[in-house]
UniProtKB/Swiss-Prot annotation:
Membrane topology, from the record: Single-pass membrane protein
Sequence intervals crossing the membrane: 277-297
Superkingdom, taxonomy of origin: Eukaryota
Positions annotated as glycosylated: N77, N192
Record-given protein name: Tryptase gamma
GO biological process: proteolysis
EC number: 3.4.21.-
Active site feature: H70 (charge relay system), D117 (charge relay system), S214 (charge relay system)
InterPro entries linked to this entry: Peptidase_S1_PA (IPR009003), Peptidase_S1_PA_chymotrypsin (IPR043504), Peptidase_S1A (IPR001314), Trypsin_dom (IPR001254), TRYPSIN_HIS (IPR018114)
Localization terms from the record: Membrane
MF-aspect GO terms: serine-type endopeptidase activity; serine-type peptidase activity
Coiled-coil ranges per UniProt: none
Length: 311
């Protein structure tokens, strides 16, 4: 179909909504807790109390972060917290988001090892998504993260028992395997029964989460998409072979999360409504590139006398 001189074509390209970092995970890294390359885990958040890192977290949408409820044992006042996103190191960066609201599943921080150790953090304003800041996908409530499944845990916590992370304070990653419920229950057996509850998931390395990793994500790749299986919750020691790390099982809380965040990214199409949208607008002499409605670049096309310009 021919176009008149004042007509144009508008093309839309939907960008995958969650779980697809622009820097791929090579799968060849040494197991056990090593520095993560920039952009590999773009949903990783640092939760800070009075500018001091206290917990990890994961970005679910431009306005919401998932973390652990016990992270707020120091304060339940949202104005005391800041959230850093898109950063590889824990530094005193001036770029952070303030917190508008904290929603804990149990209504208040519980003691270590308690059930319901999950919380949502609403940011004061949505963050801009980029190659360094992307949301992770939520699994379906029926998803099965089976025993032996290979997953990754990330954070800025201790690198061993009594060993704080050393400069340059780079984000650490460790490959872990999901542990079956029976084995984990036996590992944490007590006179009153097992400490492992139905809303908990266990995984072990030799890599493991440790102090200050709480609230961070345990993610597993399913059909090429990274889904969050767990939230770092508790454990006995760090990296002990007979004591798996214990996580809040995300599948147990997916419906609760979607109740508060309808736009949170699922493993399928439900992640797309808030995803970045590319729009290419063509006129006979002008090309405009928009991302989420923001003009990123404009190019004059037809006349060689027009120099290409970028905003």
């Amino acid at each position: 179909m021919a176009l008149g001189p004042n007509c144009g074509i508008l093309l839309f390209l939907a960008v995958s909504g969650c779980g697809h970092p622009q820097v791929s995970n090579s799968g060849s890294r040494i197991v056990g807790g090593h520095a993560a390359p920039a952009g590999t885990w773009p949903w990783q958040a640092s939760l800070r109390l009075h500018k001091v890192h206290v917990c990890g977290g994961s970005l679910l949408s431009p306005e919401w972060v998932l973390t652990a409820a016990h992270c707020f044992s120091g304060s339940v006042n949202s104005s005391d917290y800041q959230v850093h996103l898109g950063e590889l190191t824990v530094t005193l960066s001036p770029h952070f988001s303030t917190v508008k609201r904290i929603i804990m599943y149990t209504g208040s921080p519980g003691p270590p090892g308690s059930s319901g150790d999950i919380a949502l953090v609403q940011l004061s304003s949505p963050v801009a998504l980029s190659s360094q800041v992307q949301p992770v996908c939520l699994p379906e409530a029926s998803a099965d993260f089976y025993p032996g499944m290979q997953c990754w845990v990330t954070g800025w916590g201790y690198t061993g028992e009594g060993e704080p992370l050393k400069p340059p304070y780079n984000l650490q990653e460790a490959k872990v395997s999901v542990v079956d419920v029976k084995t984990c229950s036996q590992a944490y057996n007590s006179p009153n029964g097992s400490l492992i509850q139905p809303d908990m998931l266990c995984a072990r390395g030799p890599g493991d989460a440790c102090q200050d990793d709480s609230g961070g994500p345990l993610v597993c790749q399913v059909a090429g998409t990274w889904q969050q299986a767990g939230v770092v919750s508790w454990g006995e020691g760090c990296g002990r072979p007979d004591r798996p790390g214990v996580y809040a099982r995300v599948t147990a809380y997916v419906n609760w999360i979607h109740h508060h965040i309808p736009e949170a990214g699922g493993s399928g199409m439900q992640g797309l409504p808030w995803a970045p949208l590319l729009a290419a607008l063509f006129w006979p002499s002008l090309f405009l590139l928009l991302v989420s409605g923001v003009l990123m670049a404009k190019y004059w096309l037809s006349s060689p006398s027009h120099a290409a310009s970028e905003l």
